[in-house]
Amino acid sequence: ISAGFIFVIVILILQGFLVSFGQEQENRLVAALLDPFGDMALDYYTRYWTVAEQNELYIPIKGVFIYNRLIWLTIGLAVFISIYKLFAFSQNAFTFSFRKKDSVRFTKSNFGGITKIDLPKINLSFSGKTKFNLLWRLSNIDFLYIIKSWPFISIVIVGLLLNLVGLFELGNIFGTATLPRTWRMLEAGAPFTLAINICTFLYAGLLIHRSRISNVNQLIDTTPTPNWILLGSKFLAIVKMQIVLLSLIMITGIIFQIYKGYYDFQIGLYVYELIVLNLIYYVIWALLSFFVQTLIPNPYLGLFVMIVLLIGIPLTSIAGIEQSIFKYNQGPGFSYSDMNGYGSGLENYFVYKIYWLCLGIVFYILTILFYNRGISNGLKEKFKIARSRFNGKNPFFLS
């Protein structure tokens, strides 16, 4: 299942890159040939059609479109034949690791007796300092689980490769070379947004359901750890992952600038735009994804729902919902120039992000209320449990 989702995610990232790559006139043919869905191949012929031509002419099944379908049909057949020849029901799953695991033989030595163990004396502490320390340590465990997993590594590698290709293309405007200014490097990292969002949606679900997938959920549910610590550690791990991915945009940008012999890095601009301005956007999506993944028992179905929301919310303008205050995590953007920086547009950007962050916090509180701890028998029972948890400070924060 994971391999299938990795492949779908790679195709989506490739599609998003080709859409932006094909905006330049000289790249349209290459993008049209490589588009796995064939949309760019059709756009190659229909981009400049008038409304009358769109209503009267047939879909141009010719030339570039046929070549595009033949390319991907060949790739599909090659993959299918390779899998057919290599597949066997008796084979073990393929694994890959950089570390060689040494085999260890254990010998039982306590036959006919009972081994006496001196347990260490411990002092239980449930102070606030201990809880926050536990929160941080659990977040480190979840964070290592994320960055060591192959879906994450695969998505990051594909995203970085597409980002590097975008950097080389961004340096040329209609064939004219430009200086690799920092704000240009940040613009080139825009296609990496999809990879960060998909990692956020996927690992929010995998962390929420990790104990259940590993069949240790009942053991963890009996611990005296509060729900806000268990959820908070997972959320903090997601934020750490987002910071790492945003930092990769800065690292690739600096490496590209060095490659071009340009050393005015503007580290402050990198940090401010990536860690301050962009991180808010991803945190708001993370808050909603935790709520959705808590309600949905399957992390991959939750990923699909979040992708539908990510794509569908901007399209609500077609249905007449045009104001950004009704579209989650939407609002005015920002742009940077060497002449006047960010200008006066940041005020509106922060107002909208604070507005959506407040709603995201509401979703997070609802996540704590609906968090599945113990054995539950469906959504109806979740509502009963959430209602019983709705006391203390929760109504205050929701209000």
Question: What annotation goes with each model-predicted range?
Answer:
Residues I1-A3, I9-A32, P36-M40, L167-N172, ...:
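Secretory targeting signals
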Residues D221-A237:
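Amphipathic cytosolic juxtamembrane alpha-helices at the membrane-cytosol interface
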Residues G4-L86, A93-F94, Y262, P299-R389, ...:
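Terminal transmembrane helical anchor/hairpin motif
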Residues I13, F126-L135, N140-V156, L160-T176, ...:
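Catalytic cores of nucleotide-enabled group-transfer and carboxylate-activating enzymes in metabolic
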Residues T176-G189, F201-P226:
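Transmembrane helix boundary and interhelical loop/hinge segments in multi-pass membrane proteins
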Residues Q91, N110-V158, I375-P395:
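Aromatic- and glycine-rich beta-strand/loop motifs that create alpha-glucan
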Residues I83, T200-A204, V216, I284, ...:
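Hydrophobic/aromatic residues in alpha-helical transmembrane segments
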Residues R69, L73, N163, P191-L194, ...:
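Residue-level hotspots within the lipid-embedded alpha helices of multi-pass solute transporters
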